[in-house]
């Protein structure tokens, strides 16, 4: 079924990919992205592991109504989460050579 050394080479390749995957996962966990809402009036900085690091609110919004501010914060959080997902896909594509994961499968983090 496998030629001479074929199984050994396959195992080496699998180990190399696993090592690369671990490095990329560490890199993703350390990265930070910023999501925005209200044309940048609200900004949320989030890590690759979806932890919110910082929320910035333009002072002009503090005079407006509370509900609008809450909506903008939620929208900025959602934008940051979307950007994290996009960054994760890009980083993982570097490791997998662009192979797509089956529909519904998430990355292991």
From Swiss-Prot:
What superkingdom does the record give?
Bacteria
Alphabetic keyword roster: Cytoplasm, DNA-binding
Alphabetized HAMAP family for the sequence? DNA_YbaB_EbfC (MF_00274)
> SUPFAM superfamilies of this UniProt entry?
YbaB-like (SSF82607)
Q: Note the InterPro entries from the entry.
A: YbaB-like_sf (IPR036894), YbaB/EbfC (IPR004401)
Q: Transmembrane region positions?
A: none
Show the NCBIfam families listed in the entry: DNA_YbaB_EbfC
In residue numbers, the region (Disordered) covers: 87-109
Q: Source species, please?
A: Shewanella loihica (strain ATCC BAA-1088 / PV-4)
MF annotations from Gene Ontology = DNA binding
Subunit structure of this chain's protein: Homodimer.
Q: What is this protein called?
A: Nucleoid-associated protein Shew_2234
Primary location group: cytoplasm
Sum up the protein's function in the record's words: Binds to DNA and alters its conformation. May be involved in regulation of gene expression, nucleoid organization and DNA protection.
- Any one Pfam family here would be YbaB_DNA_bd
Q: What subcellular compartments does it reside in?
A: Cytoplasm, Nucleoid
Q: Which family does it belong to?
A: Belongs to the YbaB/EbfC family.
Annotated Gene Ontology cellular component terms: bacterial nucleoid; cytosol
Tell whether Glycosyltransferase is among the UniProt keywords. no
């Amino acid at each position: 079924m496998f030629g001479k050394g074929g199984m050994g080479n396959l195992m080496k390749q699998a180990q190399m990919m696993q090592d690369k995957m671990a490095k990329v996962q560490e890199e993703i966990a350390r990265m930070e992205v910023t999501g925005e809402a209200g044309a940048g009036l609200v900004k949320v900085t989030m890590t690759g592991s979806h932890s919110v690091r910082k929320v910035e609110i333009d002072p002009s919004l503090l005079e407006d109504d509370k509900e609008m501010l809450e909506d903008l914060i939620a929208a900025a959080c959602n934008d940051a989460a979307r950007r994290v997902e996009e960054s994760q896909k890009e980083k993982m594509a570097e490791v997998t050579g662009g192979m797509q994961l089956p529909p519904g499968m998430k990355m292991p983090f």
